[in-house]
Amino acid sequence: NQVDGIAAISRRDAIDFEKLGSKKPKLIIPFGINLDVYTPVINENPQLNFFHLGSMDWTPNIEGLNWFLDEIWPEINRKFPKSHFYLAGRDMPEDFYKRKSPNVHIVGEVEDAKNFINSNSIMIVPLLSGGGIRVKIIEGMALGKAIISTAVGAEGLHYKNKKNIWIANKVDDFIKAINYFNEDLQNINKMGLSARALAESDYNE
């Protein structure tokens, strides 16, 4: 109660402050990025390769990726054995390097995040907890990426499910999403272009 007001970057965060008992005025300030520095590279022949990029010293990322690799990836790999998953981020825990998950590549820290994102097809955001705005999702949208995310991962974002992002909370949801992309690989680009359009309309500084 030592402040005159609270600025939150999402409605969820504003509600969380209220749950903590704050009666102060709240202002939601949407997050934005300069799209001029995000140039999508559209692959004319997209493939079923997946990626995650995020700080690996953040507990929700570790929790979500362990869940994804333990519960979701084995089924994806069984149904789509030619697919690959590339996991990148700074401060990668040693446990991830020790994993023996098939077709999972632990990249670690990358020099150029935009180049890494542009070199892959489908962003995976398997968050189960955590607040704030998922900056990496907005960056992925800005670079024209198809994105599969849990509902928690997409909290605070404006989106239309299955148009500019695909929400998946359990293994069947992920399989349905990947089936959609696999039926026509151009659907990867279709959703990515829709995501870019959303970034331009809602998240451009």
For the regions a protein language model found, what residue spans apply to each?
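Conserved acidic donor-binding segment of nucleotide-sugar-dependent glycosyltransferases
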Residues: 165-172, 180-185
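A short, well-ordered alpha-helix in the C-terminal region of glycosyltransferases
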Residues: 180, 187-201
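Short acidic/histidine- and often glycine-rich active-site loop of Leloir-type glycosyltransferases
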Residues: 151-162, 166-167
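Alpha-helix capping/helix-boundary segments
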Residues: 12-14, 92-93, 153-154
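Short hydrophobic beta-strand element within catalytic cores of glycosyltransferases
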Residues: 136-139, 146-150
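Donor nucleotide-sugar binding/catalytic pocket of nucleotide-sugar-dependent glycosyltransferases
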Residues: 1-40
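Conserved catalytic-core segment of nucleotide-activated headgroup transferases in glycan assembly
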Residues: 28-119
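Acidic donor-binding loop of glycosyltransferase active sites
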Residues: 4, 118-132, 143-146
